[in-house]
Amino acid sequence: MTMSLIQACRSLALSTWLLSFCFVHLLCLDFTVAEKEEWYTAFVNITYLEPEPGAAVAGSGGGAELHTEKSECGRYGEHSPKQDARGEVVMASSAQDRLACDPNTKFAAPAHGKHWIALIPKGNCTYRDKIRNAFLQNASAVVIFNVGSNTNETITMPHAGVEDIVAIMIPEPKGKEIVSLLERNITVTMYITIGTRNLQKYVSRTSVVFVSISFIVLMIISLAWLVFYYIQRFRYANARDRNQRRLGDAAKKAISKLQVRTIRKGDKETESDFDNCAVCIEGYKPNDVVRILPCRHLFHKSCVDPWLLDHRTCPMCKMNILKALGIPPNADCMDDLPIDFEGSLGGPPTNQITGASDTTVNESSVTLDPAVRTVGALQVVQDPDPAPQEGEAIFTTNSGQEPALSSDSDISLIMALEVGLSDVELSTDQDCEEVKS
């Protein structure tokens, strides 16, 4: 899995997550708006004349005290018109009919067609039936008081189908207070006015289920993306580690094929004007072991070997030693090919910093005996001491100037060397192909 594909999957998953979040958020807003409930409170103002103790007749006016109480304790029904209502409060004529569940319930309505308000306790039948029975008796309004649990609570009563009469609910204490006054034959007048508008929001079960499912799906998508991402990341890391191990093995093979020399006293590497090791920035001393790379740069063996294992390139010119030696990461054919660059060229290497770049041969395709190398009719003997001895011919090509040829014999010697190397390279390639097959 390439990095571009992983990034594309990451972007797709992130976009999906954001779109899902916005979609769920909008739907949640819609569900919230759909579940809003609007209801109104009602001010209940009652007025009555309470007789003084010892008075013969209640409401006669003599010795009576006028009481007025007003509180925002009522709540309009769901289908009730939101308007004012006034009238005398009455209950059912008989105690058995006070629940007003029977359509034939009779109320003690005042004479002369005065407006009256029916007071009915909760229970035994629906609010709709109670309100309809009072409406059929020409009540101006219906007041239902709560009974039982949560006596101080009022609700928005549903009474669909009976929408032409004002209907409110009051708490049980207020209702029982009015009932006690009526049982004492005290006339109670009630005035109902509109109170505060309220907007209540409810969370429906449908919206909760939908949001929960959407959230779960969103989390599953995110979790699946995370699992996919980390699996691909793990596979990529493993592949990278395997590649590094293969490259490390190939680097070890390549390092084993590179020439190693021991600096001796009198070698030109020990001279003060010779370049230092580019890794440790120290000069070369006798008995120092150096590694010679295919690019003819040399370094201390202990300095350059760790570098080559990690980077597989020359610290100076960045030449890849695997490519220079023709060793792929899984090469098997190159294991038995010893490399001796100095002997193949007939002399010690020349450092590039000094201005002389030597002409090199692809050592990975040349197999020569370490002691004796035969090139055509030319035999070159390698002395254990790599320093040039008197009488030896060292063939190098300087990048700044061409070496002068002293005679025709020198030209013949160079041509023989080139032809011989070509023949040896061809035969070596054939042997390599046979080993592979």
Curated annotation (Swiss-Prot):
Pfam families: PA, zf-RING_2. A zinc finger (RING-type) spans 277-318. It is found in: Membrane. Residues 80-182 form the PA domain. The chain crosses the membrane at residues 208-228. Residues 1-34 form the signal peptide. GO terms for molecular function: zinc ion binding. SUPFAM superfamilies: PA domain, RING/U-box. It is a single-pass type I membrane protein. Residues 229-437 are cytoplasmic. Glycans are attached at N45, N124, N152, N185. Keywords: Glycoprotein, Membrane, Metal-binding, Signal, Transmembrane, Transmembrane helix, Zinc, Zinc-finger. One of its GO terms (cellular component) is membrane. This is RING finger protein 150.
